[in-house]
Amino acid sequence: MAQGDDNKQAIGQIIRQEQALIFPSLDENDAFSLGQRIRDIAVKDKLGIAIDISLWDRRLFFAATAGATADNTEWLRRKFNVVRRFHVSTYRLVLEQNREDRMFAPYKALDVADYALAGGGFPIRVSGAGVIGAVIVSGLPQREDHNLVVRAVAEHVGQDPVALALPAA
């Protein structure tokens, strides 16, 4: 199968993820539980990552595991800005934009210092409220960052993570 066909299938699956992974509500306790779930997976699998769960106006959860770097926290910030701007998964945008340089097209006027075209940011969509924040992971290859977030969110909201996962690249 051609790369373009693979991307189209992955984009379709990510759209299904975004439609399925709806929170009934989200408060500080939910954010902590979700963040801890991601951290537990990372510790068990020895993944060096940084994790951020934020609403548009404040951070609710942050953690880093052994192996994460200061660069990972910077990537978190830039991925958050992308989710805030577009209200979709950052990996979906990576595949839709199909750019090697990880920068948005110049006509979008998005500074690379503040916006990263990289997977790992996922919108927090609350039933009846819409997108209110983002869950973000940084430290793995971008598809793995994305899959880790989707797995944890799916488990948190009672969806089947295997059915929603993107296949390995």
Curated annotation (Swiss-Prot):
It comes from the Bacteria. Pfam families: HbpS-like. InterPro entries: PduO/GlcC-like (IPR005624), PduO/GlcC-like_sf (IPR038084), YBR137W-like (IPR010371). SUPFAM superfamilies: GlcG-like (SSF143744). Belongs to the UPF0303 family. This is UPF0303 protein BAB1_1430. It comes from Brucella abortus (strain 2308). The lineage of its organism: Bacteria, Pseudomonadati, Pseudomonadota, Alphaproteobacteria, Hyphomicrobiales.
